[in-house]
Structures are given as structure tokens and as C-alpha cells.
């Protein structure tokens, strides 16, 4: 496994940052729970670029499934690439890079993949154009993003309504689009793709273990992650509001009736 560094242009601000409560969720991600829509396209020998790979848990699965095909994981955060680099595979590389200026020649990869990335960039169409550039003719660009406006939960807890409203305000204040899932198709069309297959899937948290895992993460995130600081700095929330939201997540996690669904839009666009 080799690691490379490239000059990275200053990125849009990542709303959640890389607090331990955020990386806890990122290391949970797998092909099964986050890229199942792409699974039928994965075959040995295929090359793949994983943009915004984070700590690399999905990327290393790609490397195992596609071997001996080359897999490259890329992220704009050097500290996250350091974490991902613990995965050692002969066909796997990690690098620090910029989605707007990918350090590859044209027509390099069979698949260019981005999970939960386009929601965080100010220019998703430009990012998709650059992803298309490095995809081989007939290859695919695959993307999956959550849609915060579509998240539903039970029981009704007013603090969670406040959470979503404040989160969306902060996310947009940082240059992103929290309702990206519903926009993936139109962004791909604007990027020049003509053949865009769409699908949708949902993360669901309901049993006691899942509620505790998800609820405790947000209970902590709203007080200690980059989101908390930005909410205060942007005037989107007061400290008292954030503390109330943290308690709301604890209330939801402790409720036997607790249920939450997070919808995701998905696209497979042919280059």
C-alpha cells in the first residue's frame, strides 16, 4: 500500500468535522449498509476511485472484492487518510486530494465512487464533471447521499425538529446542501451525463442497540463536533438549544418505541 500527497485547494467546510463521534459513524460504513446499490457492478479486476473515503472501511471492501483491480481511496483530510492507511492491501492506495482537481489522467477508472460527498461541496456539478473526466468511456460514476429533509422518526420529539432545522441551516452556511439525495439526478444531468440510473435506500435505527449507538453519537455531536461550534458561530443556535437537542437525542435513544429512517438518493451515471 502506498500513500501520496497532492496539493489540495481549500475545501468547503465539512459540517461535522472529524470528532471521535463522527468517525465512529464513518467506521461503521460498509458496502452492505452504504453501497449495496453498487454491489452488482463489483467484479474482480475492476479499477475504482473512492472519493471522500474517510477512514477507509468501504474502500478496503472494494479492494478485497475487486482484486487484483486497482483501488484508490482519496480524502481531503490528511488526518483521516492516516487512519485509513492502516488497511494494507497490495492493490490499495490512499492519497490526499481535491475532488475539483483529481490527480489522475483522463479515462483512468472503471468506477468512480463518492459516498456522502456531494452534499458537502459547494459545486457538486463541477465535482461530477471531474469525476466523469477520470472515468473510462463506458465506466460509471456512482454517488449516494442522505436527504435530511426526508428523515423521519418516532416518537415525535420537538428537540429533534429543532436539530434538523439547525443542522440544515449550518450545513448550507458551510456551502453544502443537506437535501442532496433528491438532487443527485439533476446534478448528474447538469454535469453532462445522459444515462443516469437512480435508486434509493434507507438507514434504519430501531432496536435498542441501534438506538443507543445512533442516539449517543448525536447526543455528543451536537455539543462537541465541528457542527456545534459552527451552530454557535453562525448564530443558528444557542448553547442552551444545543444542550436541549442533546437531551432530545437521549430521550429518543431511551424510548422503546424509538424508530428513525434516513433516506438516501443513489445514482449510477454512465461516462
Give each language-model segment a name.
Residues 49-51, 55-101, 126:
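Class I SAM-dependent methyltransferase SAM/SAH-binding core
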Residues 142-211:
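Conserved catalytic/acceptor-binding region of the Class I
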Residues 27-44, 61:
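Conserved alpha-helix/loop element of class I SAM-dependent methyltransferases that forms part
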Residues 125-140:
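A short glycine-rich, Lys/Arg-flanked "PGG" loop and its adjoining helix->strand segment in the class I
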Residues 10-14, 20, 197-260:
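C-terminal helical/coil "lid" or tail adjacent to the Rossmann-like core of SAM-dependent
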Residues 191-194, 262-271:
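Core SAM-dependent methyltransferase catalytic element
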Residues 110-124:
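A short SAM/SAH-binding and catalytic strip from SAM-dependent methyltransferases
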Residues 100-111:
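A short acidic, Gly/Pro-enriched loop at the edge of an enzyme's catalytic core
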Amino acid at each position: 500500500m502506498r500513500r501520496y500527497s497532492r496539493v489540495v485547494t481549500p475545501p468547503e467546510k465539512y459540517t461535522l468535522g472529524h470528532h471521535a463521534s463522527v468517525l465512529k459513524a464513518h467506521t461503521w460504513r460498509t458496502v452492505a449498509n452504504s453501497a449495496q446499490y453498487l454491489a452488482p457492478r463489483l467484479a474482480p479486476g475492476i479499477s475504482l476511485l473512492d472519493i471522500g473515503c474517510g477512514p477507509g472501511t468501504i474502500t478496503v471492501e472494494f479492494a478485497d472484492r475487486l482484486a487484483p483491480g486497482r483501488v484508490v481511496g482519496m480524502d481531503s483530510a490528511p488526518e483521516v487518510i492516516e487512519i485509513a492507511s492502516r488497511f494494507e492491501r497490495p492493490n490499495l492506495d490512499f492519497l490526499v486530494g481535491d475532488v475539483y482537481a483529481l490527480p489522475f489522467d483522463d479515462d483512468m477508472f472503471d468506477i468512480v465512487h463518492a459516498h456522502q460527498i456531494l452534499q458537502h461541496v459547494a459545486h457538486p456539478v463541477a465535482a461530477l464533471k471531474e469525476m466523469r473526466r477520470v472515468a473510462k468511456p463506458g465506466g460509471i460514476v456512482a454517488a449516494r447521499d442522505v436527504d435530511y429533509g426526508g428523515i423521519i422518526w418516532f416518537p415525535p420529539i420537538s428537540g429533534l425538529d429543532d436539530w434538523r432545522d439547525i443542522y440544515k441551516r449550518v450545513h448550507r452556511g458551510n456551502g453544502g446542501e443537506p437535501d442532496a439525495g433528491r438532487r443527485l439526478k439533476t446534478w448528474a444531468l447538469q454535469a453532462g451525463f445522459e444515462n443516469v440510473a437512480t435508486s434509493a435506500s434507507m438507514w434504519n435505527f430501531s432496536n435498542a442497540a441501534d438506538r443507543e449507538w445512533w442516539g449517543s453519537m448525536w447526543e455528543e455531536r451536537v455539543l462537541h463536533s465541528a457542527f456545534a461550534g459552527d451552530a454557535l458561530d453562525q448564530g443558528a443556535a444557542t448553547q442552551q438549544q444545543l444542550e436541549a437537542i442533546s437531551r432530545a437525542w437521549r430521550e429518543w435513544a431511551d424510548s422503546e418505541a424509538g424508530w428513525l429512517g434516513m433516506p438516501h438518493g443513489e445514482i449510477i451515471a454512465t461516462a
